[in-house]
């Protein structure tokens, strides 16, 4: 039966990683691995548009056949935003190597190699400069700003406030931070542009006015 990989710790500093490698001879069964992962350089600015990735849960595995098929320990998947919407296109496959080992865990023969792939790239229409500017306008406020190119229909900016830092979820957000996000009355996890519920208010007035003009009720 193949041995299962168990992740003891991740997101190690280079100093920690080097120290483990130095004592590796005295740590049988342990294998330090350098991997690639997500990084969100604009922090809160794109959080509601891009969403974030986090460790795949049992629900992710049961609801998505592709995630279940490609699951390996430590797999991170999209939880909301574009990360979740395009998960099946963005997810890659890991390189898998299987070895025959002796009683001491030493490799004696390579049995199988499956080369992985990176998955697809995704290009969006958001203008970073305008996106950051809308974030500055919303700083300290609760609300949202959305800007669309009227000729192409492309979304140039979509910002919701308050926001959150998607990098906090990469290696598991702690209980206190998660509780603070969920208990915040201004709902930083909600994209107010597309998920907020609002009464029509003055937005319906132009529609009523145009209808009245069309029917010669007003001039």
Q: What function would you assign to each model-found segment?
A:
Residues 129, 148, 203-207:
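An amphipathic alpha-helix/helix-turn recognition signal
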Residues 20, 49, 134, 153, ...:
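Residue-level preference for non-acidic, small/hydrophobic
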Residues 149-156:
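Short, glycine-anchored, charge-dense loop/turn motifs used at functional sites
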Residues 54, 160, 212-218:
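Hydrophobic/aromatic-lined pockets within catalytic cores
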Residues 1-144, 159-192, 197:
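Extracytoplasmic/periplasmic proteins that interact with beta-lactams or build/remodel peptidoglycan
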Residues 166-170, 204, 213-219:
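Short, well-structured active-site flanking segments
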């Amino acid at each position: 039966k193949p041995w299962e990989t168990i992740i003891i710790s991740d997101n190690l500093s280079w100093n920690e990683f080097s120290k483990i490698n130095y004592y590796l001879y005295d740590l049988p069964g342990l294998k330090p691995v350098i991997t690639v992962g997500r990084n969100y350089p604009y922090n809160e600015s794109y959080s509601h548009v891009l969403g974030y990735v986090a460790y795949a849960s049992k629900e992710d595995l049961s609801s998505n056949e592709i995630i279940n098929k490609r699951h390996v320990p430590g797999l991170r998947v999209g939880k909301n935003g574009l990360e979740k919407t395009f998960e099946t296109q963005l997810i890659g496959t890991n390189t898998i190597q299987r070895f025959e080992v002796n009683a001491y865990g030493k490799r004696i023969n390579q049995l199988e190699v499956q080369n992985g792939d990176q998955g697809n790239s995704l290009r969006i229409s958001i203008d970073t400069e305008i996106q950051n500017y809308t974030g500055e306008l919303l700083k300290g406020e609760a609300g949202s700003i959305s800007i669309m190119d009227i000729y192409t229909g492309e979304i140039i900016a979509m910002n919701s406030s308050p926001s959150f830092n998607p990098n906090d979820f990469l290696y598991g957000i702690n209980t206190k931070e998660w509780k603070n996000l969920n208990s915040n009355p201004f709902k930083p996890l909600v994209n107010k542009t597309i998920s907020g519920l609002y009464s029509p208010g003055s937005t319906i007035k132009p529609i009523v006015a145009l209808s009245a003009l069309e029917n010669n009720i007003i001039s």
